[in-house]
Amino acid sequence: MSHPYASPFAEVIGDPIAQSKSPLIHGFWLDALGMEGDYRRAHVKADALAAYIAERRADPGWRGCNVTMPHKAAVMDLVDDPGDIRGTIGAMNTIVRQPDGSLIGTNTDAAGFYSPLAELDLEGAPIAVVGAGGAARAVLFALARAKVGKVAILNRSPLKAMGLLATFGLKGDVVALDAALPPVRLLVNASSLGMAGQPPLDLDLSPLPDDAIVYDLVYSPLRTGLLKAAEARGLDTVDGLDMLIGQAALAFELFFGAPPPEGRDDELRALLVA
């Protein structure tokens, strides 16, 4: 893979960070394009975040970083231009260093989530989303831009879910996790349910129409119980690697000035699940 400490370089920061697959993704693309550069993990604790940003800002070889938990909110106060993130998604997952050392923050999660759905016309379509955390905010932001119809949020905290509908100007309802699913066009799991080490997401998919799509943001395991149930019903599915790769593709171009190579996604997916 790409050589460590090559310049230019970008990083992914978080605490913990060892589990991140971002270095595999960006390293694969750098090698495939024959580009100079590197992308690596940086374990940054909360009390060292400001010092990390200040140090990297002064390094002209540093192109920026992706941001994972628990820093996605805190970094908004450490960049020069956070855009409209604070009042919308409320989380920043990408920082890009400009030639003058100024830092621009953005969030590629929403666009990354929507990339495998881009060919669909979801305007006015009914949607169901499981979860009301940070991932759900990115999902709802993207769905609002797509002008979807009513959105049902399945979540244990009704007030939090209703607040998200209001934040993104969406019409819809809050549904209990054990209630019957509405007959939606798209069902998205934006929670940690079904992830390795977490409780399963047990939903009865029988109310879904035959043309429904089931999208699970979880990618460990890749074939979650939800996706297996959807496949058993003959429904189209989208797994969590699509969002992971989609958001990384946008960040890669911001960091290194070139889009990822085309036609190599199957190789990349095989690398990520190996």
Swiss-Prot record:
Positions of NADP(+) binding: 84, 131-135, 217, 240
InterPro entries given in the database record: Aminoacid_DH-like_N_sf, NAD(P)-bd_dom_sf, SDH_C, Shikimate_DH, Shikimate_DH-bd_N, Shikimate_DH_fam
GO biological process: amino acid biosynthetic process; aromatic amino acid family biosynthetic process; chorismate biosynthetic process; shikimate metabolic process
Active site: 72 (proton acceptor)
Lineage top rank: taxon: Bacteria
Pathway: Metabolic intermediate biosynthesis; chorismate biosynthesis; chorismate from D-erythrose 4-phosphate and phosphoenolpyruvate: step 4/7
Annotated positions binding shikimate: 20-22, 68, 93, 109, 219
KW Transferase (keyword) present: no
Alphabetically ordered keywords of this record: Amino-acid biosynthesis, Aromatic amino acid biosynthesis, NADP, Oxidoreductase
GO molecular function: NADP binding; shikimate 3-dehydrogenase (NADP+) activity
Reactions listed under catalytic activity: shikimate + NADP(+) = 3-dehydroshikimate + NADPH + H(+)
A single Gene Ontology CC term: cytosol
EC number(s) reported in the record: 1.1.1.25
Functional description taken from the UniProt entry: Involved in the biosynthesis of the chorismate, which leads to the biosynthesis of aromatic amino acids. Catalyzes the reversible NADPH linked reduction of 3-dehydroshikimate (DHSA) to yield shikimate (SA).
Assembly behavior: Homodimer.
Family, per entry: Belongs to the shikimate dehydrogenase family.
UniProt name for this protein: Shikimate dehydrogenase (NADP(+))
Organism: Sphingopyxis alaskensis (strain DSM 13593 / LMG 18877 / RB2256)
Highest classification ranks of the organism: Bacteria, Pseudomonadati, Pseudomonadota, Alphaproteobacteria, Sphingomonadales
